[in-house]
Structures are given as C-alpha cells and as structure tokens.
C-alpha cells in the first residue's frame, strides 16, 4: 500500500502534468471534471496532513508557468482563481460559512455572473489608454499579450467618459462564440489547418499567437468581471456598481449579471442559466457568485489561492472519460460516410452516452484514434457527443487501427472521396437503403413537409418492406398498408394518412428544402423560392443566374443546377405534383412599393435574439421586403447582431457592412 507521502507526490505530479497541458500547451488531455476530482483528492489529503503541504503544491498556486516565447508581465495584484462547488448542498455550506464569518446581522447580497469558458486576462489602462495586457499565467506572472488583445474589437483601446482613474487594471475573460469556433474549424478542415477541440482551446490558441495578424482574424470577444490595480481615482463600493461603471467607460459587461438577495434566489439564478445555456451562443461551465459589498469582501479576505467572498458554482461535467469499444460507419441521406465511436456507456452532462461522432477520416487521423483507446467525450447542450481527444498516456497495449471502408457498409457500392472534400460518400444513390431512409426522414421532418406522426421507425419499416422508394411513394400509402407495420393500429394508420394529405399543402421554400439538395438549408431554400418565384423558373436557371441569389455561391449553385439536370430527380418532382403536392402562387413583392427601411435589402441575422425568435424575425423582415440570407458576403446590405455574435459579425465589420443590434431592429420593425 502506498504511503501518504507517495500518494501526495503522485497526485501533485499528475496535476502539474495536466496543468502544463491545459495552461501552457492549450491541449488538455483530461476533462475539467477529472482535474477537479484530482485536486479535491489532493486538498483533502493535505487537510488531513498539513505538515506535508509543500510551497509548490498545485493547491498553493493558481495556474502554470508562462511560455518562454512571450515576454512576461508581473501582476501587481495577484490574479487568484476561485474555489468551486458542484451541488446545492456545497453552495449552501459556503453561504453559511460566509454568514458565520461576517458575525453580524448585516444582510448579504450576492452578485451572480456567468462563468465563461475562455481565457482570463488583465488589461491595464493608464489615463484611459490601453497600455498592456497579460494572461493569468501562474497568478503572479503572466504572458504579455498586449499586441493580440489590441486586435479584439470588443476591447476599447481608449476608455471614454468622466472620472477615469489614472491607472485602472480590468480583469475579464476572452472567449470565442460558438459560431466563430465552428467557422474556424470549418476553415481549418478545408485548408488542412489545426482543428480545435472546443471553443476554450480555440480562444487560448488564438490569443497566444506570436503573430497578432492571425489573432485579428479570429472573432474573439471579451467580458470584464473585476478590477486589479486602481490608482488615481475611485470606483463604486459594490461589485455591480463597478461593472456598471466599466460599461459606462466602454468596457463590455455581460447583461446576465444579476443581484440576488438570498441563497434561494442564487439557486434560482443557477437553474435559469443552466436552462438557458444551450441558447447563449457561447460556452459557460457554471455561474460565479460574489458578495456585492466591497466592505464585506474586505472583511472576509482571502485564503491561499482564492477569495473567501466568492465561489464558482459549476454545472454537471460536460466532459468525461471512457473507452472506445468499436468504430462503425453510418450512411447519410447524401451518401456521406460518417464514422461513429461505440463507447463504454458514460454519463455526460446528465445523459448516458454510448455513441460519439468522429466526423470523417481526417478527424480520426487528427485524433490518432485506435479502437480500445481511452478518450475524452464532450457533450454541450443539444450537440451530438464527440471525441475531444485520446488520452495517449493511458493507451492500452491491445488497441486496433480504425480502417475506413472502401465499399458502402449498407449496399456495397464504391466509396468515393472527391479531392478537396473531407467527406467520403457512397456512390449508390437511391439504390442504397440507408440513403433512401435518411432522404425520406428529411422529407417528412418538421421543417420540411412536416408530416405529423411519420417517425423514423415507420420510415425504416417502409423502406425495409419495399413499400416506399421515393418521396412520391409516401403519398400513395393507404391505411390498410400502414396497418401491417409494427405497432401501427387502424386508428394510427389513418392519422398518418390524414397527416400526409394535410402535408400536400405546403410552401415553395419548404418543398425545396424537403427535396434534400446538397448544401441547400432552410435559409437558402427560402432565398431560392423568393428569387425565382416558381419551380419552372428555378429548374431553368443557369449556374450564373443561381449565383445572383443572396447566400448562393458557385458550390451551392452547382449542386442546385445538377440536381434539376438529373432526370430521376425531375421525375420524382413530377410524381409529387401529380399526387397533389402544391403551394400558393407567388406574391410578387415590389420593394419600391413597401415603406420600410428593410425593403429590397439583403439581411443576415447573427447571435442570440432575446425579444423574439429567429424564425419570427425572419418572417417579419421578409414581410417588409427584405431578403434574409444565411451568411455574410459582398451582396449583404445589413447585419443584425444579437448577443454573442460570432464570425458573421467579424466578416461584416471586415467588409464594411452596416451592423445594427436587436434593439435597433425592433425600433425599425415598429417604424
């Protein structure tokens, strides 16, 4: 059995290794939850044996050493981290400790914020001008990232307003919105560059580039949450008051900061943020709870590495470790072959996960994944679980290579990978049962033809029994034929037939989206429908004409043109129309006759809207004569940016396109 000294040494060595990977290399190997568990284990042992605590123990400092490639900045006021709690019981215990330490009847008000998952930085302003910026580093010394921080548009180079202190050091988090993260990885996959595991790594990698020109191309943003140095000036005596003052001086502050008058209100805030988490547009891993009164903060003081007056209340872990038992290959509706990892089941963010996507062959190669490997699994919001990285330091000896198929695992047709594309595809087309199933599932989905009650299991049976080969065959189904399916009684069968009859009345945009043309999503389908007005006009359009539609470039135009050039596709469309599928004749909207600031403009929505849904906003804009596109290009006239807008906003600013916020959009919609 190991001695206590050996256990402590092993834990410290392991934690230092993972701190180095996380803070210095921006390449964490284990989930945060596993790091937290190891740290708790070390802290508990040291609490029982305080005589064995060493000055260099991970419990006695904040982070890891800075990279030698950057010059260093010593923090005049140390940048401490926060202690964590992981459940309501632990938070209530923290709340009681605070009340007991204050030893007074004075009321405690809590200031609650989002715990952003990015990179902590300090920014020093002298006479209102940004003079330096640094990472947290080890809490005492950080890396000089001034040149890179100056490229972040959210951070003012000069504060504005009155009574700005002579020296003011603000602290906050640089992070990357999810839309920007996806765009960076999409570009990297296309060009063979580095693909990041998550937005936090991407933000850290972007901020710590030696070439600021690379940082400038990344859509980083920033929220401030505190102060370090303060000289030659005053700030309000509450935490919220300081944040509001920062905002007046032009510094970005999250609009989700909330005052809570009791522990019950704090818990309600925590659960509301947890509920809203998937729609925020950026990653958070909990909430931060601070005493609002600066006087009470000073009274409570600090422990070795954290303040006594604040705590991070973390959400259930979104990353866990498990083993890959096998890799199987699925076939999508366009023939895309997607590798899927079959996992030893593990609970991630409250959900039992047994499968995770591996995207494509390049991703398997990037990960260096082998069957039998120990891996980190991530699940964020409604996103399909994915493998973040392989824990190479714990690779078993009996792992096996993942072999990508050369023939379709469903129909046996050749698998083809077009040069320049990451995705390999089955060449079988509709002779492939898997493609047929997925195409039909897409056709009946809610945002396409919206056939109520026609679920995946019904489609699977219809294809397997050879009842349905094309979408048009769906409308030939009878209640009698459907009754023969598993768990389908006469009443349910008649309901499906009625739903199919109802679905025949649709819109041109929904019909186009339902056809499943490659690269044609809802926004593009709506744009094509609005531009051409009729199916006949769209079918006859050339590639050049198609590119005149907002959000349609050469790739999408080619896919659309090729789809309608294929005789089998035209035959299916003819059959659908013959079965009674129809939509209203186009209403020609003359932008010149509409009295609206949006009339005739190509508009792009980005970020999260708080006052109305994105669908409602799109519908309202179209009513007022706008064309709503899905991406920013030189054809774009206006970008409406909600909270945490990402790469689309950055591109709009780069192209000099007019940008307004949600409040201005609502004002114009009402004008």
Swiss-Prot record:
InterPro entries assigned: BRCT_dom, BRCT_dom_sf, DisA/LigA_HHH, DNA_ligase, DNA_ligase_AS, DNA_ligase_CS, DNAligase_adenylation, DNAligase_N
GO cellular component, one term: cytosol
Active site: 115 (n6-amp-lysine intermediate)
Named cofactor requirement(s): Mg(2+); Mn(2+)
The keyword Ligase is annotated on this UniProt entry: yes
Chain ranges of the BRCT domain: 593-671
Any single Pfam family the record assigns to this protein: Nlig-Ia
Enzyme class: ligase
Reactions listed under catalytic activity: NAD(+) + (deoxyribonucleotide)n-3'-hydroxyl + 5'-phospho-(deoxyribonucleotide)m = (deoxyribonucleotide)n+m + AMP + beta-nicotinamide D-nucleotide
GO molecular function (one): DNA binding
Descriptive protein name: DNA ligase
Designated gene of the protein: ligA
């Amino acid at each position: 059995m190991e001695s206590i000294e050996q256990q402590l040494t092993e834990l410290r060595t392991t934690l230092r290794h993972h701190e180095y990977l996380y803070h210095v290399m921006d390449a964490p190997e284990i989930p945060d939850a596993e790091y937290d568990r190891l740290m708790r284990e070390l802290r508990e042992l040291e609490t029982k044996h305080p005589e064995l605590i060493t000055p260099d123990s991970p419990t006695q400092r904040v982070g890891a050493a800075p990279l030698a490639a950057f010059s260093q900045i010593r923090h005049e006021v140390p940048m401490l981290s926060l202690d964590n709690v992981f459940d309501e019981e632990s938070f209530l215990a923290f709340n009681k400790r605070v009340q007991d330490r204050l030893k007074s009847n004075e009321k405690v008000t809590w200031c609650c914020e989002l715990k952003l998952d990015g990179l902590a930085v300090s920014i020093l302003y002298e006479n209102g001008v940004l003079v330096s910026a640094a990472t947290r580093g080890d809490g005492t010394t950080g890396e000089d990232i001034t040149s890179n921080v100056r490229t972040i548009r959210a951070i003012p180079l000069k504060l504005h307003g009155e009574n700005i202190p002579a020296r003011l050091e603000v602290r906050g988090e640089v992070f990357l919105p999810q839309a920007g993260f996806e765009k960076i990885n999409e570009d990297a996959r296309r060009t063979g560059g580095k693909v990041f595991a998550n937005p936090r790594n991407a933000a850290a990698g972007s901020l710590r580039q030696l070439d600021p020109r690379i940082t400038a191309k990344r859509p980083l943003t920033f929220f401030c949450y505190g102060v370090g140095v303060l000289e030659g000036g005053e700030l309000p005596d509450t935490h919220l008051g300081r944040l509001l003052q920062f905002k007046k001086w032009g510094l970005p502050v999250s609009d989700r900061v909330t005052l809570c008058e009791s522990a019950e209100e704090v818990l309600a805030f925590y659960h509301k943020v947890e509920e809203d988490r998937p729609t925020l547009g950026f990653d958070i891993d909990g909430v931060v709870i601070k005493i609002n009164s600066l006087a009470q903060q000073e009274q409570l003081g600090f422990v070795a590495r954290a303040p006594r007056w604040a705590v991070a209340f973390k959400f259930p872990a979104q990353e866990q470790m498990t083993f890959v038992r096998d890799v199987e290959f699925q076939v999508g509706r366009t023939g895309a072959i997607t590798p899927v990892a079959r996992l030893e089941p593990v609970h991630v963010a409250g959900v039992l996960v047994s499968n995770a996507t591996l995207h494509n062959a390049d991703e398997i190669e990037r990960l260096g994944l082998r069957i039998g490997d120990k891996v980190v699994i991530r699940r964020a919001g409604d996103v399909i679980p994915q493998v973040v990285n392989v824990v190479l330091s714990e690779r078993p000896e009996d792992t096996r290579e993942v072999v990508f198929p050369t023939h379709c695992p469903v129909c046996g047709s050749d698998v083809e990978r077009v040069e320049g594309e990451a995705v390999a595809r089955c060449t079988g087309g509709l002779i492939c049962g898997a493609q047929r199933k997925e195409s039909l599932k897409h056709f009946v989905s809610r945002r396409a033809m919206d056939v109520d009650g026609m679920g995946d299991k019904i489609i699977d049976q219809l294809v397997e029994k050879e009842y349905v080969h094309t979408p048009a065959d769906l409308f030939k189904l009878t209640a009698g034929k459907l009754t023969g399916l598993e768990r389908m009684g006469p009443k349910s069968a008649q309901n499906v037939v009625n739903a199919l009859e109802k679905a025949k009345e649709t819109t041109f945009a929904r019909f186009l989206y339902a056809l499943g043309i490659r690269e044609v999503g809802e926004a593009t389908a709506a744009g094509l429908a609005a531009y051409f007005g009729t199916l006949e006009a769209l079918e006859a359009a050339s590639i050049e004409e198609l590119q005149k539609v907002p959000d349609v470039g050469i790739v999408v135009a080619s896919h659309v043109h090729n789809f309608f050039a294929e005789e089998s596709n035209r035959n299916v469309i003819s059959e659908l129309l013959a079965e009674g599928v129809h939509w209203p004749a186009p209403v020609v909207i003359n932008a010149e006759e509409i009295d609206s600031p949006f009339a005739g403009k190509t508009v792009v929505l980005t970020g999260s809207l708080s006052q109305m849904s994105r669908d409602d906003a799109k519908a309202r804009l179209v009513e007022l004569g706008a064309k709503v596109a899905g991406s920013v290009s030189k054809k774009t006239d206006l970008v409406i940016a909600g909270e945490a807008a990402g790469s689309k906003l950055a591109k709009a600013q780069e192209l000099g396109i007019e940008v307004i916020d949600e409040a201005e959009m609502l004002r114009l919609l009402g004008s």
